[in-house]
Amino acid sequence: MSKDLSKVRNIGISAHIDSGKTTLTERILFYTDRIHAIHEVRGKDGVGAKMDSMELEKERGITIQSAATFCNWKGTDINIIDTPGHVDFTVEVERALRVLDGAVLVLCSVGGVQSQSITVNRQMTRYNVPRIAFINKCDRTGANPAKVTGQLQEKLQLNAHMMQMPIGLEGDLVGMVDLVTMKAVYYEGENGDEIRITDIPAEMLDEATEKRETLLEEISMFSEELMEALLEDSENVDIDLIYKAVRQGTIALEFTPVFMGSAYKNKGVQALLDAVETYLPCPTDVENIGLDLDNEETEFAVTNNDEDPLIMLAFKLEDGRYGQLTYVRTYQGQLTKGDTVYNRRTGRKVKIGRLCRMHSDEMEEIDGVGSGDIVALFGVDCASGDTFTNDAVNCSMTSMHVPEPVISLSIKPIDNKAQINMSKALNRFTKEDPTFRTFVDHETNETIISGMGELHLEVYVERMKREYAAEVEVGKPQVSYRETITQRAEFNYTHKKQTGGTGQFGRVAGYMEPLDEGDYEFVDKIVGGAIPREFISSCDKGFQKSLVKGHLCGAGITGVRCVINDGSFHAVDSSDVAFQIASVGAFKDGYMKAKPVIMEPIMKVSVEGPSEFQGAVMGSINQRRGMIIGSNEEGTYSVIEAEVPLSEMFGYSTTLRSLTQGKAEFTMEFANFKPVPKTVGDNLIKAHEEERKNG
């Protein structure tokens, strides 16, 4: 079961939507003999790309779930996670990056570094993922890989350098110049699988020599051996020294090699596969950190050793045609069919029935797996982000960063059968996607779903219908507002109830103040036993209950520190419940004195389209209470960056289409919360009061 980990690569393919990422994965599977025919993403043959296995994905031509697949290139096992490019699905990208050792950042040679490329790059940086860049679509009109490499340096602050030069561009693209071997590589034959290597065309030699000198100078910083070799004889440097230096720089996150081609036209993909094998790290090159649960979550380095106790992380759940699949990454130790492992979050024992490698939605059963690998398990009940170990170790892998949802919808099943199916669907979706939340609003008795954007929720409503036959009526999208306080305020509240028998008594006093970071903090400054120790946590519970619904517009309260410094109790009548009720009253007493305000989610919006529509687009953003934070023009194309309240963005795609004749597109992601203007706040308060009267 043990395998040579230097021959394993766990990689992700991440990009902006429509950069040709799924097409690239499709070609990789073809060249590594995993599939024997090529299908396009929006293919006329009705098959769709291999990695887009959900019906919804084939229809929309976007990748929603990050399918994991396995292939082998020249003796190296490669696990590929194909991640969604749409900003509403960023949690899928984050989850994939958490378990990967390296990544390929795919860019469009015309669009260059777009808004989602910036988001993905930021996520890669957060998880210290070494990356190589692939500039795709070099066959398109306006292709300019040199310009895109410049954008990688300027916009993403990456030390990016071209490892190749295109031979011909746009419709004339026939191959690449390899700047390491100084050879011309042509991709011929119907599927680009006949590779011809020749000398560099004479007219390109000077430029190639110059670019190679720059490249060698840059990477010599990562290898003393290479630096010495260059000083001795820069014309005849050992190629292996170059490969080694690029690898060292890439793994240290100090260098980003740039490759190029056209996946659609079958050019440059094999060189990218060589680069994955040569430059991206194997599991032992990367340090993964675990938290020791027996020692106050002290960090420790995971070993990648098969002989050590098992540690693995569930990073994705899927309900496919084979039942529930749990994708796991093994960090150390071995797992064999029939083993019993422990879910460290729930404390439950789990018996492993079947193990398999997934190839998009087809599977290949295996008997066991060693450290550093990615596999799928059957029938394991868990949530995404759970850590599994054997009984010799009690630890957790660091939890993943999960953004807060910003948009909500009410959904109502059309009949009883739909109600039952909807419950099943929601139970599964919340387990597999931590940014998808659901709750029942007891005042209106409606089921509310929350997520990262309109498309995110649309996809789940659609999946309910398709996968669970749960027909639901969908309400209008609702913005997730928040309430917070702006100044310190004292509170002092006594709860007293006497109705025969044991009564209730509790007094809570102290103050609340704005909290700069975080949602809520409880501080106990009680001295001299004014409130007995056993009731301190009751006060905390009461305050937390108060945060659920604010007094202005009914939104959740955030950014509050509650400090208790006095109180009183009764030897007989004081209880847990009495102090919880007293704390709720104390919170109410202080809240309105603390000058509360309503906060709304602000989105970072990026609009890309022809420059001729720039004025109209800016006007449409200003009308939506937006603030333009930057714009730049590149030829006939312009990109406008703005911050706009989410409540103003509903239906914007329709507006933008009609303003720009369908030629512009926009992406948005959550930026921050800001106080609403007075008029908007007054309307929200009024609407909330009306609702309460009618409710």
Swiss-Prot record:
Keywords of this entry: Cytoplasm, Elongation factor, GTP-binding, Nucleotide-binding, Protein biosynthesis
Disulphide bonds in the chain: none
Residues binding GTP, per UniProt: 15-22, 82-86, 136-139
Originating organism: Desulfotalea psychrophila (strain LSv54 / DSM 12343)
NCBIfam families documented for this protein: EF-G, PRK12740.1-5, small_GTP
UniProt-annotated location(s): Cytoplasm
Family named by the database record: Belongs to the TRAFAC class translation factor GTPase superfamily. Classic translation factor GTPase family. EF-G/EF-2 subfamily.
PANTHER family in the cross-refs: ELONGATION FACTOR G, MITOCHONDRIAL
Entry GO MF terms: GTP binding; GTPase activity; translation elongation factor activity
Name of this chain's protein: Elongation factor G 1
